[in-house]
Amino acid sequence: MPPKAADKKPAAKAPVASKAPEKKDAGKKTASTGEKKKRTKARRETYSSYIYKVLKQVHPDTGISNRAMSILNSFVNDIFERVATEASKLAAYNKKSTISSREIQTSVRLILPGELAKHAVSEGTKAVTKYSSSTK
């Protein structure tokens, strides 16, 4: 028979021994050392080193500020995103599931104006040829 309301004790915490073992999370204290684990910074991929290398090829004695580098990095990301989006649309129009160099080339011609598109296509073709010959 269940105990009466007056006989019931208030709810207490369960004994420690009966608890399920807890998983250790990053940032919590470890049992052995008592120190917190260091959290690693989230890596941000940028084109800064590549932009800097090109700058030094063109103008060896010229530097660049962090703000200018940030602007150029945003510019490169924007152009890549536009080219990728356009190439994706072209592949979808042609009912293909793979973006090839042809779609990239066509999207560059559509996005970049006149002479800039011609130079970009020729440099891209040169880079693909160089890569293809080095992997053989």
From Swiss-Prot:
GO MF terms, alphabetically ordered: DNA binding; protein heterodimerization activity; structural constituent of chromatin
Transmembrane segments: none
Keywords assigned: Acetylation, Chromosome, DNA-binding, Isopeptide bond, Nucleosome core, Nucleus, Ubl conjugation
Ion transport recorded as keyword: no
Post-translational modification note: Monoubiquitinated to form H2BK123ub1. H2BK123ub1 gives a specific tag for epigenetic transcriptional activation and is also prerequisite for H3K4me and H3K79me formation. H2BK123ub1 also modulates the formation of double-strand breaks during meiosis and is a prerequisite for DNA-damage checkpoint activation. Acetylated by GCN5 to form H2BK11ac and H2BK16ac. H2BK16ac can also be formed by ESA1. Acetylation of N-terminal lysines and particularly formation of H2BK11acK16ac has a positive effect on transcription.
RNA-binding keyword on record: no
Cross-link position per record: Glycyl lysine isopeptide (Lys-Gly) (interchain with G-Cter in SUMO): 8-9, 23-24
UniProt xrefs under PROSITE patterns: HISTONE_H2B (PS00357)
Modified residues (N6-acetyllysine): 8-9, 13, 23
Predominant location: nucleus
Cellular localisation: Nucleus; Chromosome
Residue ranges, compositional bias (Basic and acidic residues): 1-10
Cross-link named Glycyl lysine isopeptide (Lys-Gly) (interchain with G-Cter in ubiquitin), sites: 130
Summary of subunit composition and partner proteins: The nucleosome is a histone octamer containing two molecules each of H2A, H2B, H3 and H4 assembled in one H3-H4 heterotetramer and two H2A-H2B heterodimers. The octamer wraps approximately 147 bp of DNA.
General function of this protein: Core component of nucleosome. Nucleosomes wrap and compact DNA into chromatin, limiting DNA accessibility to the cellular machineries which require DNA as a template. Histones thereby play a central role in transcription regulation, DNA repair, DNA replication and chromosomal stability. DNA accessibility is regulated via a complex set of post-translational modifications of histones, also called histone code, and nucleosome remodeling.
Record-stated family: Belongs to the histone H2B family.
Record protein name field: Histone H2B
Organism from which the protein derives: Rosellinia necatrix
Recorded name of the encoding gene: hh2b
